[in-house]
Design a protein with these regions (language model features):
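Zinc-dependent deaminase catalytic domain
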Residues: 1-136
C-alpha cells in the first residue's frame, strides 16, 4: 500500500486533487503512465508502484486531455496519444503531495516527497514537483 498522501496537480489554472489507490486491484492508469512505470528498472520501482496519488492524478489529467484530443479530430481518435502530446498536455504542470496523518500528528499536512517511481514519472512528463515549504 502506498503511504497515505494527498496530492494536487495544477495545469494551466486547473487543479486536480486525489489520494493514492488502496484497494485490492491496482488503479487503471492512462496507457502512457502504465507503459512508463512498466519500463522502470527495479532500483527505480516501489512495491506499490502505480498506486500513488501522483500516478493516479497524472493518469486522470492525461485521460481528460486524451478525450478532448480525440473529440476534436477524427484522425486523432484513430491513434493513441503520443508521449510528446502527453508532455504538451502537461506543459507547465506542478505537482505537490502532503502527508495524511491522524489529528495531532506533526507530519499531517507536511510535504511528502514523491517515491522513486513517481519522481521518475514526473521527470519523464516534465512535471515540476513543488515543495511548498521551500516557496517564499
Amino acid at each position: 500500500t502506498p503511504p497515505a498522501v494527498a496530492a494536487a496537480l495544477s495545469v494551466r489554472g486547473t487543479t486536480l486533487t486525489g489520494t493514492g489507490a488502496r484497494g485490492d486491484q491496482p488503479p487503471a492508469l492512462h496507457p502512457l503512465v502504465q507503459d512508463f512505470l512498466d519500463t522502470l528498472t527495479s532500483e527505480r520501482r516501489e512495491r506499490f508502484t502505480g498506486r500513488c496519488a501522483e500516478a493516479v492524478l497524472l493518469s486522470r489529467h492525461l485521460t481528460e486531455a486524451d478525450a478532448t484530443r480525440t473529440a476534436r479530430s477524427k484522425r486523432a481518435a484513430r491513434r493513441p496519444m503520443t508521449p510528446g502530446e502527453a508532455r504538451k498536455a502537461l506543459k507547465g504542470a506542478k505537482l505537490t503531495t502532503r502527508h495524511i496523518r491522524e489529528d495531532g500528528d506533526p507530519l499531517h499536512g507536511a510535504f511528502a516527497p514523491p517515491c522513486r517511481s513517481c519522481t521518475a514519472l514526473a521527470e519523464h512528463f516534465g512535471v515540476r514537483v513543488i515543495d511548498p515549504t521551500l516557496q517564499d
